[in-house]
From Swiss-Prot:
The gene is ytfE. The keyword Iron applies. GO terms for cellular component: cytosol. It comes from Yersinia pestis. This is Iron-sulfur cluster repair protein YtfE. Homodimer. Gene3D superfamilies: nmb1532 protein domain like (1.20.120.520).
């Protein structure tokens, strides 16, 4: 397979666990899923040959994940809501509370991620509104077989995906790429573990929508 000239989104669809590899190398396969592996790797000065070897190894591994290219879109929508929307609604309020505690207790330390709670609160508010619009407007259109007429709502949802991606960049800057400092307390470490889990979930969530659900819906499937 010609990996280097494939888009990150296409590779994430075709190769199980490629998303984890991309995340390890800071390759944006969700909002930036249309760029080729070669272009994305060159931007980050990554070894393209090594990446291709890793992708080849992943492609030969047995896997049991769902083939969302073949599943009905109603099934994919149900999965997105239960696996990601509901999960984000659980994750974010707890992360905000932990961030507030860390800033309150450790605010005088130079390594304290001051402003993190406010940024997470903004993500919570905007993502809650975003998911509501998907569940109340866009997803019902797709479920009624009107996906090919949903280019307007899809454009808005993709723009909002880009916006939350920019917010995640701010979170990473505030947290030294979500790396707890030496001597961080248990709450601080739990916060960063939770943020990393949230970022992984959100990237997979956006990937499924941008690179699978929306294109299939626009094709009228």
């Amino acid at each position: 397979m010609d990996y280097r000239n494939q888009s990150l989104g296409a590779l994430a669809i075709a190769i199980p666990r490629a998303t984890k590899l991309f995340r390890q190398h800071q390759l944006d396969f969700c909002c930036g899923g249309k760029q080729t592996l070669l272009r994305a790797a060159n931007k980050l000065n990554l070894d393209i040959d090594a990446l291709e070897a890793q992708l080849s190894a992943l492609q030969t591994e047995p896997h049991s994940s769902e083939d969302w290219q073949q599943q009905p879109l109603t099934n994919l929508i149900s999965f997105i809501i239960s696996r990601y929307h509901d999960r984000h609604r659980e994750q974010l309020p707890e992360l905000v509370l932990m961030a507030e505690k860390v800033e309150r207790v450790h605010g005088e330390k130079p390594t304290c991620p001051r402003g993190l709670a406010a940024e997470l609160s903004a993500i919570l508010e905007e993502l809650t509104q975003h998911m509501y619009k998907e569940e109340q407007i866009l997803f019902p259109m797709i479920q009624r077989g009107m996906g090919s007429q949903a280019s307007g709502p899809i454009f808005v949802m993709e723009a909002e995906h880009d916006a939350v991606g920019q917010q995640l960049d701010v979170v990473k800057q505030l947290t030294q790429n979500v790396t707890p400092p030496e001597g961080a307390c248990n709450t601080w470490r739990a916060l960063y573990t939770g943020i990393n889990e949230f970022i992984t979930d959100l990237m997979e969530h956006i990937h499924l929508e941008n690179n699978l659900l929306f294109p299939r819906a626009l094709r009228g499937e």
